[in-house]
């Protein structure tokens, strides 16, 4: 018999690479699917246990969410900062409702509001707010309260609908020249922030921000804010922020409108900005806040001690007191006008 030997040829490396790539691909698909279901179940759970307060009102083919409490006039209208929903006012609205009617709302695409087909500029947001108030049957006069970017919106509202506005409170409001006056290194950080927000928006449908703890521990906040459409709208507002600044720069004086300007404590610790940028940033901010207070001959300015940018969360009593003072001034001025009209 012939001498024969059997040789087992090795499996090519390419074969094993294909197996590994396929396995990784399948694993990624499974993890993405698991994250997708986790996110959707979590959103549904949060909103089931914390249902939407207030109502949704049609403003021209899409609906915006508004929540009004209390009674009396003028009506206080709360406009949140960039990417924030109505829940940013949760510590102040119940207190304001004790002395007048107060409404918080969600801009289009945020919280419980639908997306809008219109450009996301501050002028458009002011127009949408006026339509929302009108369609919801909430009559002027209004005391407008704007936090951060919301300050642009309420100033544009006052410019467009001056006869409907009885007073204004600016809560650490943005200034239309802030990007020009801040250190360039700080503006460069904004570009990094945009990239981070783009990643978070893409990751949101798969539950990654929630898993990383970015949604927070308050279920009421999660129900309104922790969802894909809110993250996407926040990113859009971030990208159109310069347009809002340019629009606001065209608005003029507020005349003798009752005005309160609240500013964060420049000595409060700042964790997300390099130490060498904090002082020049705060110096510029202080000057710009003074300029905001001088928009009206009745303007006042208060620094909220031990408060960050979110004064309404850190020092809600300061915000409530400022709003109360402006409401009282507006009522007094209206009373004087009524008496003057009766004497004629």
Model regions: which residues?
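Flexible "cap/lid" subdomain of the alpha/beta-hydrolase fold that forms the substrate-access gate
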Residues: 122, 164-294, 299, 303
